[in-house]
């Protein structure tokens, strides 16, 4: 019998996000957990986007100055009985405070970054190696994430948790053959790291194809000014309406310079849509390549993009991908994520 202040797992996380909260709800149904959130100024607790969704687990919201939150976290770690301490990442001071105060044998870290996007030289590398000496277990989201912890000399246990959280899952669409591939869709923020200027330039050369861009951001007006007639902007779309856009599209495209995971790729696949991704997307290996549900092109390589675009626009090959997507079981996928955590 677990006492009120005893938990199987104590999670240390940044401001709550819906996809993490849904995962924590599922884990808490199997074993008692506590989540300590530290407020991120860029994602304050009052931001409704990150507060949506009920929390069915015990949690604490830490606010104020970083020093105040560090002191509060230190007291929590010291006075709470837990079987495992799991910190979300290694680049925040709160993760360091937690793993330094907790016994190494209880310490674990969730890795959402990949080796591709990580600095490999300099004093920060030494700091990260010190951090990983205080950790006994690393939860990763695929091979590219495991490569990162091994690069920093981690010798402990590695557990593949498959994903960073739970998407707003819908029933997987049944397979329906399509006779042509012309409609592409992008969903996300309109910011430099998403590489949308480069993507729009590609569609200038393909007036026979259509690209729908869903989202808002600092580059919105600039992108609209450079976009040809076959590129359409919708602005912000409610989450409840996104499935119809995914399912109407033939291909979801994500050309980002960097995506530590890419949860939006899961959303597209859950809506039956094959994907076309740059090689900098973290989920490409486990989720896309291994399941044969999309194609990957080398970042900013126009020739390679054109090759992969030509392949995915071939109706026979496209329908092969689409049939594979229809076989994906995201309910089972979520069960496996939870199972990875509870071991």
Regions from the PLM with identified roles:
Residues 274-278:
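Short hydrophobic beta-strand element within catalytic cores of glycosyltransferases
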Residues 316-343:
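A charged, aromatic-enriched C-terminal amphipathic alpha-helix characteristic of glycosyltransferases
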Residues 133-173, 178-179, 234:
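Donor nucleotide-sugar binding/catalytic pocket of nucleotide-sugar-dependent glycosyltransferases
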Residues 107-123, 134-137:
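A short, histidine- and acid-enriched strand-loop-helix "catalytic/donor-clamping" loop
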Residues 221-237:
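Nucleotide-activated donor-binding/catalytic signature segment of Leloir-type glycosyltransferases, i.e.
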Residues 236-237, 244-249:
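Short alpha-helical donor nucleotide-sugar binding micro-motif in glycosyltransferases
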Residues 176-194, 200-206, 211:
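Conserved donor-binding/catalytic core segment of Leloir-type glycosyltransferases
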Residues 257:
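Aromatic "clamp/platform" in nucleotide-sugar-dependent glycosyltransferases that forms part
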């Amino acid at each position: 019998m677990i006492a009120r202040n005893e938990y199987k797992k104590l999670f240390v996380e940044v401001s709550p996000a819906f996809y993490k909260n849904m995962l924590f709800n599922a884990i808490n149904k199997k074993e008692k957990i506590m989540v300590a959130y530290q407020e991120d100024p860029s994602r304050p607790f009052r931001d409704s986007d990150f507060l949506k969704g009920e929390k069915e687990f015990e949690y604490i919201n830490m606010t104020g100055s970083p020093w105040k939150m560090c002191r509060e976290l230190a007291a929590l770690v010291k006075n709470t009985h837990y079987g495992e301490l799991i910190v979300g990442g290694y680049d925040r001071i709160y993760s360091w405070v937690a793993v330094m105060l907790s016994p190494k044998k209880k310490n674990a870290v969730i890795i959402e970054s990949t080796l591709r996007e990580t600095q490999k030289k300099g004093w920060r590398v030494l700091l990260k190696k010190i951090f990983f000496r205080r950790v006994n277990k690393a939860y990763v989201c695929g091979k590219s994430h495991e490569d990162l912890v091994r690069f920093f000399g981690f010798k402990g246990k590695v557990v593949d948790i498959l994903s960073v959280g739970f998407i707003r899952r819908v029933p997987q669409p049944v397979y329906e053959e399509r006779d042509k591939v012309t409609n592409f869709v992008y969903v996300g923020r309109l910011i430099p790291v998403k590489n949308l200027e480069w993507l729009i330039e590609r569609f200038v050369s393909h007036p026979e194809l259509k690209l729908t861009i869903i989202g808002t951001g600092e580059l919105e007006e600039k992108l609209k000014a450079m976009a040809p007639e076959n590129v359409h902007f919708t602005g912000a779309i409610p989450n409840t309406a996104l499935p119809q856009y995914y399912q109407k599209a033939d291909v979801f495209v994500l050309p980002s310079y960097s995506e530590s995971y890419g949860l939006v790729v899961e959303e597209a696949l859950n809506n039956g849509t094959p994907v076309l991704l740059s090689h900098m997307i973290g989920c490409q290996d486990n989720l896309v390549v291994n399941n044969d549900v999309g194609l990957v092109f080398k970042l900013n390589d126009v020739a390679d993009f054109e090759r992969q675009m030509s392949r995915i626009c071939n109706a026979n090959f496209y329908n092969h991908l689409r049939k594979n997507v229809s076989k994906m079981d995201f309910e089972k996928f979520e069960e496996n994520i939870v199972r990875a955590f509870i071991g």
